[in-house]
């Protein structure tokens, strides 16, 4: 008799995705981050749901409702800090996941890669709207500054901004719609995750060698379920340590001051995971140019499959590309640091150089190096 997990219509899908899935035998811990992102999304949806039960999306009571959650709701402070730091863990896993895709050439799986970039944009939009909800100073001014960037779009910009605001400034209408969108987007993200996995399972996973492993695959369970569980354990440990011992380590003190439209904070800056893009935005003196650079800093990932003419899929045996990859990582860390600094010398200069290096590496230096390495293969 056939096992029920192989014959039942619903269990069969789960079985083919999580149990009997043929997996390369040599994938490293860097392949754990996909499942960790799934865990992060689950944590965010559950904690977010409990927060939404007590939160009120109204400019007069939003800040107080967050204080009420932290003071009066049973373990409300834990849920709030798990949600806030869970977002940081989410982005940490996301950046490593994308970095692994770049290093090991996973961008050759075009459909999976492109859905992944759409997912990255969706998660960034969700996180931005979530940051506005506590209605502190940085929430209000962050929302004002970032939404106001759309006014740089020629002809329709101003109308578009007022349409998003629901008025002539960031107000109750803005907060209400941001809450509604922040609530619905994680479920849209969940659907996109299913599509991401559907495309991935069409082709199968890549591996560190970049070699076809069809003749040598092993079942996902028990090998990789055990391996993923260890990753989940470490992620939980890190998240709980952050939420319970250092809950405000990555937050902004300004957000403990209620939003005041008449008082601008000295340094408006987003959360740490947006700082690299914010630094690129600020490094261009023109408003429209800055907005375009900001969008292109992420959108450039979509053209990477067409910019990499490499004969070997992964960087495993390409030392020049490896060196450039780590320069790119250092450059992104520099941009993250610059994004949190005030707009003055020498930070302006460093930011401009780091932004130029970022785009040069992606568009010109790395593809040229690939061509050189292709030539070296013939020597």
Swiss-Prot record:
Quaternary structure and interacting proteins, as annotated: The cytochrome bc1 complex contains 11 subunits: 3 respiratory subunits (MT-CYB, CYC1 and UQCRFS1), 2 core proteins (UQCRC1 and UQCRC2) and 6 low-molecular weight proteins (UQCRH/QCR6, UQCRB/QCR7, UQCRQ/QCR8, UQCR10/QCR9, UQCR11/QCR10 and a cleavage product of UQCRFS1). This cytochrome bc1 complex then forms a dimer.
GO biological process: mitochondrial electron transport, ubiquinol to cytochrome c
Record: residues binding a ubiquinone: 201
CC cofactor: heme b
Gene expressing this chain: MT-CYB
InterPro entries in the cross-refs: Cyt_b/b6_C, Cyt_b/b6_C_sf, Cyt_b/b6_N, Cytb/b6-like_sf, Cytochrome_b, Cytochrome_b_C_euk/bac, Cytochrome_b_N_euk/bac, Di-haem_cyt_TM
Signal peptide annotation: none
Record's keyword annotation contains Lipid metabolism: no
Additional remark text: Heme 1 (or BL or b562) is low-potential and absorbs at about 562 nm, and heme 2 (or BH or b566) is high-potential and absorbs at about 566 nm.
Subcellular location: Mitochondrion inner membrane
Native organism: Lepilemur dorsalis
Organism placement in taxonomy: Eukaryota, Metazoa, Chordata, Craniata, Vertebrata
Name recorded for this polypeptide: Cytochrome b
Entry's family note: Belongs to the cytochrome b family.
């Amino acid at each position: 008799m056939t096992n029920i997990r192989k014959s039942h219509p619903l269990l069969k899908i789960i079985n083919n995705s999580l149990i009997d899935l043929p997996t390369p035998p040599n994938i490293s811990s860097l392949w754990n981050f996909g499942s960790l992102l799934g865990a992060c999304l689950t944590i965010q949806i559950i904690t977010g749901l409990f927060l939404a039960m007590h939160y009120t999306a109204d400019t007069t009571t939003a800040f107080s409702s967050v204080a009420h959650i932290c003071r009066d709701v049973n373990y409300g402070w834990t849920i709030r800090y798990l949600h806030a730091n869970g977002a940081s863990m989410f982005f940490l896993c996301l950046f490593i996941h994308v970095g692994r895709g770049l290093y090991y050439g996973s961008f050759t799986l075009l459909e999976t890669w492109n859905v992944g970039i759409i997912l990255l944009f969706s998660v960034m939009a969700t996180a931005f709207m979530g940051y506005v909800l506590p209605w502190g100073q940085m929430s209000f001014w962050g929302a004002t500054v970032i939404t106001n960037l759309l006014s740089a779009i020629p002809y329709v910009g101003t109308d578009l901004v007022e349409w998003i605001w629901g008025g002539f400034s960031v107000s109750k209408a803005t907060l209400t719609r941001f809450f509604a969108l922040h609530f619905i987007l994680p479920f849209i993200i969940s659907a996109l995750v299913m599509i991401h996995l559907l495309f991935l399972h069409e082709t199968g996973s890549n591996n560190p060698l970049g070699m076809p492993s069809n003749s040598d695959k092993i079942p996902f369970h028990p090998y990789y379920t055990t391996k993923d569980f260890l990753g989940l354990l470490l992620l939980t440990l890190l998240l709980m340590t952050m939420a319970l011992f250092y809950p405000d380590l990555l937050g902004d003190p300004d957000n403990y001051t209620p939003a005041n439209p008449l008082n601008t904070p000295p340094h408006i800056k987003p959360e740490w995971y947006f700082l690299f893009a914010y630094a690129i935005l600020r490094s261009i003196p023109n408003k429209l140019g800055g907005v375009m650079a900001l969008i292109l800093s992420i959108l450039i990932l979509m053209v990477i499959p067409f910019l990499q003419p490499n004969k070997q899929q992964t960087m495993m045996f390409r030392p020049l590309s490896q060196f450039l990859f780590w320069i790119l990582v250092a450059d992104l860390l520099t941009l993250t640091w610059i994004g949190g600094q005030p707009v003055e010398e020498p930070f302006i200069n460093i930011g401009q150089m780091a932004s130029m290096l970022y785009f040069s590496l992606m568009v010109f230096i790395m593809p040229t190096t690939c061509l050189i390495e292709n030539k070296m293969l013939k020597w």
